[in-house]
Regions:
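N-terminal capping segment at the start of a domain
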Residues: 23-57, 83, 234-238, 242
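Surface-exposed loop and adjacent secondary-structure segments within mature catalytic domains
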Residues: 163-177, 216, 223-256
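Intrinsically disordered, low-complexity acidic Ser/Thr-rich regulatory segments
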Residues: 190-209
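Non-catalytic positions within long, well-ordered alpha-helices that form the structural scaffold/packing
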Residues: 72, 211-218
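Hydrophobic residues within beta-strands of alpha/beta enzymes
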Residues: 148, 222-223
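Noncatalytic luminal/extracellular "stalk/propeptide" segments of secretory-pathway proteins
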Residues: 35, 44, 48, 52-186
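Bacterial Sec-dependent N-terminal signal peptides
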Residues: 1-23
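Extracytoplasmic/secreted envelope proteins and their assembly/folding machinery
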Residues: 23-27, 40-43, 47, 61-68, ...
C-alpha cells in the first residue's frame, strides 16, 4: 500500500509540473497576442500582397513558400509535401468592364477560376440568349462578336460544360420547342377567334441552353446575373479531370454580373 501511494504521489507531482509549464506557455502566447499581435500584418501579406490563392496558381505557391518561411523563422522545422497534381494551372489577371451608351456604368462582376479570359479589351453588342431552336436560327447571324445575357441566378460556378450539362440543356431545348409549337397554335387560334388566351411559358431556369452552338457562332462571352456579394468559384471539370490540357480549355468568357446591373441591362 505504501508503494502505491508513493507512485500516485509521484504522478501527481509530475501532473502539476506539466500543467504549470503548459499554463506558462499559454500565458506567454496570450501576452504576445496582446502586446505584439502580427495577425493583421500577416493577413495583409496574404490578402493584399499575394491575393487570391486558388490551387494551381502561382499565388498559391507563393503563399505556401511565405508561410513556410515564417514557420522556419519562428524556429519550426518545415517540410513541404506534394498534395496532388492538376492538369493545368490558372493565374488570374486584371478584370474590368463598362457599359457604353447613354446609361453607361462601370460593371461590377467576377469570373470563376479556370474559365477563359479575353485577349485585351473586347467591345460588343448585347443579346438575350435564345430559348428555342427557331429563336437560335433567327439570331445566329447576330451572335458573332456579341455578349450574351444568359438566364438563371448564379452562386459562383461557371456554366456546366460537361456531357451531363449538354444532356440537360438538350432536353430543355426539346421541351421548349414543343411549347413554342403549341404557342404558335394558340396565337393562330387567338387571331382566328378574336380571343386572348395566354401563351405557355418557356423553361429558362437552366442557363446557356445553346452554349456550344453560341460558342461556335463566335460570341465574346456570357453574362449571368449573380447575387451580391459576388462569389467566384471554379470550373470543377478542369480541376477533377486529368485529361484536360491546354488544347481543350474553355475559350469563351463566363461573367457573373451584379444582379442589379444585369437587370438594368436586360431592360
Amino acid at each position: 500500500m505504501k508503494r502505491t501511494l508513493l507512485i500516485w504521489a509521484s504522478m501527481a507531482c509530475m501532473t502539476v509540473h506539466s500543467v504549470t509549464a503548459q499554463d506558462a506557455a499559454v500565458n506567454k502566447i496570450i501576452e504576445i497576442g496582446q502586446t505584439d499581435n502580427q495577425v493583421m500584418d500577416h493577413l495583409d501579406v496574404l490578402t493584399n500582397r499575394i491575393g487570391g490563392r486558388v490551387i494551381g496558381s502561382n499565388a498559391y505557391d507563393n503563399a505556401v513558400e511565405w508561410v513556410a518561411s515564417k514557420f522556419t523563422e519562428w524556429g519550426l522545422e518545415v517540410e513541404l509535401q506534394e498534395a496532388g497534381t492538376l492538369p493545368v494551372g490558372f493565374n488570374r489577371g486584371p478584370w474590368f468592364g463598362k457599359l457604353l451608351g447613354e446609361n453607361g456604368m462601370e460593371l461590377h462582376f467576377v469570373t470563376p477560376s479556370y474559365t477563359a479570359g479575353t485577349k485585351g479589351v473586347q467591345r460588343g453588342h448585347v443579346l438575350q440568349e435564345p430559348l428555342t431552336q427557331s429563336e437560335f436560327d433567327r439570331m445566329k447571324g447576330q451572335l458573332k462578336g456579341a455578349w450574351v445575357l444568359i438566364n438563371g441566378k448564379n452562386v459562383g460556378w461557371p456554366v456546366d460544360r460537361s456531357a451531363k450539362g449538354d444532356s440537360i440543356r438538350a432536353a430543355i431545348i426539346s421541351e421548349n420547342n414543343e411549347t413554342a409549337k403549341k404557342n404558335r397554335q394558340i396565337m393562330e387560334d387567338n387571331w382566328r377567334n378574336n380571343t386572348d388566351n395566354p401563351l405557355l411559358p418557356l423553361k429558362e431556369d437552366v442557363p446557356a441552353l445553346f452554349y456550344k452552338q453560341m460558342c461556335e457562332a463566335g460570341v465574346l462571352g456570357f453574362i449571368q446575373s449573380a447575387t451580391v456579394p459576388l462569389r467566384a468559384l471554379y470550373d470543377k471539370a478542369i480541376i477533377h479531370d486529368p485529361t484536360f490540357t491546354f488544347d481543350n480549355l474553355p475559350e469563351v468568357c463566363d461573367i457573373k454580373l451584379d444582379e442589379h446591373q444585369y437587370a438594368a441591362i436586360k431592360k
